[in-house]
Amino acid sequence: CSRAQPMTDALCVDGIQRAVRSLEKAFRDGNDLDAREDMALCALYSGMALANAGLGAVHGFAAPIGGMFDAPHGAVCAALLAPVWAANAKRVSNREKFDRVDDLLGGDAVSWLRGMTERLDIPKLSAWGICEGDLEEIARKAAAASSMKANPVSLGHDELIAILREAL
């Protein structure tokens, strides 16, 4: 996010490390208390980070989608994570933080996110009734969403449509 600073970066790095080791474990085995503790801390850290640094394009999309469709917020965000990360990574001028996340996620954040989305059976946006004909309205509303202001790059209309298409 464009308003990130050292405190939010530290929270996010620790949260990412915990999610890497525990997200799938907690998903598969709710009795794994160590994994659940890690994920509880991830949730806490992410709340602290978003309160201080803002959100970005994932939530910029999720707000209008949630208002237009009966779609769970978390599932929508998860479906959008990899396409948004890929779009941002192509355009960001300072790669330092993106490279750090790549390292934390085994060298390629987009591949890790796509793989985790598949392993956790996260539905595509089309599962919630979203179709090609809805993309223009979603993109228009997303572009105006307050969450988009903290995205690390300004995404144009065509980029917003491409992200949505990839997540369909």
Language-model segments: which ranges?
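Short, amphipathic C-terminal "tail helix"
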Residues: E132-L168
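Catalytic-loop motifs flanking and including active-site residues across diverse enzymes
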Residues: L11, G15, A57, V76-L80
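Short alpha-helical scaffolding segments that buttress acidic/His motifs in well-ordered protein cores
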Residues: M39-G47, L81, L113, T117, ...
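Gly/Pro-rich interdomain helix-loop hinge
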Residues: G67-D134
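Short acidic alpha-helix initiation/capping motifs at coil-to-helix transition points
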Residues: V13-Q17, G56, V92-S93, W112-L120, ...
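Carboxylate- and glycine-rich phosphate/diphosphate-binding segment that chelates Mg2+/Mn2+
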Residues: C1-A53, P152
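Hydrophobic packing residues in well-ordered alpha-helices of helical domains and bundles
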Residues: C12, R36-M39, F98, L135, ...
